[in-house]
């Protein structure tokens, strides 16, 4: 079995692959102050619930956009799994991803892993949208090379900025509103955040297609992918565990 960890700024997604299938997965809050023992005990508890043991795991691979958390996770892997974790961007593992980008070192590990998984499954050209703390758009060109992208504030950041900086506006939940025109302040905010974000997605995808002169398949991943994709006119496929699949694929190709 392979244990995979996708560490984001807000959430960390964990998964176990058995014979190529994602059999278990969990989403936890990212805590950059946790020690290796706290991570070990948390994972032990999650494993116990699914009747898994540390001994079942034969490999560990990590993608992280939060550098301070890596030391604790790598030590946890050694102490609890007795395995040296593979770390995307740090361990000398090949990703088998072609690059048409001037400085590949600045690309986030999660974006690389997503691109590996998406190109393996869907070919090219592609637009990969990852709805995380930041929303990222990655363009894979006709030669199946990573060719750049767009980074915008995530929907949660946009929502928090609204109520944090406007003293009379309340905190709201992200959900589809009943109408576009709100009849209350909360309804108006919900509509603005939700439909404003969908407009951003559809608008940026159209601009990418127009600029590149291609008709790429558009893949969405991340915690809010299903919610946004349901109303978006431009998203073709939702892959909620794209990053976990990419980690598994990279590990398998290197072993």
UniProtKB/Swiss-Prot annotation:
Substrate binds at residues 101, 108-111, 185. Its EC number is 2.7.1.33. GO terms for biological process: coenzyme A biosynthetic process. It is found in: Cytoplasm. Signal peptide: none annotated. It comes from the Bacteria. This is Type III pantothenate kinase. The lineage of its organism: Bacteria, Bacillati, Bacillota, Bacilli, Bacillales.
């Amino acid at each position: 079995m392979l244990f995979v960890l996708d560490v984001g700024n807000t959430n960390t997604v964990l998964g176990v692959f058995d014979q190529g299938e994602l059999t278990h997965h969990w989403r936890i809050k990212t805590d950059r102050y946790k020690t290796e023992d706290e991570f070990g005990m948390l994972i032990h508890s999650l494993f116990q619930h699914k009747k898994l043991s540390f001994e079942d795991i034969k490999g560990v691979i990590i993608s992280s956009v939060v550098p301070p958390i890596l030391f604790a996770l790598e030590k946890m892997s050694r102490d609890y799994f007795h395995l040296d974790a593979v770390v995307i961007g740090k361990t000398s593992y090949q990703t088998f991803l072609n690059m048409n980008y001037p400085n590949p070192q600045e690309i986030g590990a999660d974006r690389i892993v997503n691109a590996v998984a998406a190109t393996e499954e869907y070919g090219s050209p592609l637009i990969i949208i990852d709805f995380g703390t930041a929303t990222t758009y990655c363009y894979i060109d006709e030669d199946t090379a990573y060719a750049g992208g767009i980074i915008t504030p995530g929907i949660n950041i946009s929502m928090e900025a609204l109520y944090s900086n406007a003293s009379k506006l309340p905190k709201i939940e992200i959900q589809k509103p009943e109408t576009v025109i709100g009849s209350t302040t909360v309804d108006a905010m919900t509509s603005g955040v939700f439909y404003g974000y969908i407009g951003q997605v559809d608008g940026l995808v159209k601009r990418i297609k127009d600029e590149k002169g291609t008709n790429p398949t558009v893949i969405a991943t991340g915690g809010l992918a299903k919610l946004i994709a349901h109303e978006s006119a431009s998203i073709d496929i939702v892959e909620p565990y794209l990053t976990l699949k990419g980690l598994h694929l990279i590990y398998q190709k290197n072993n």
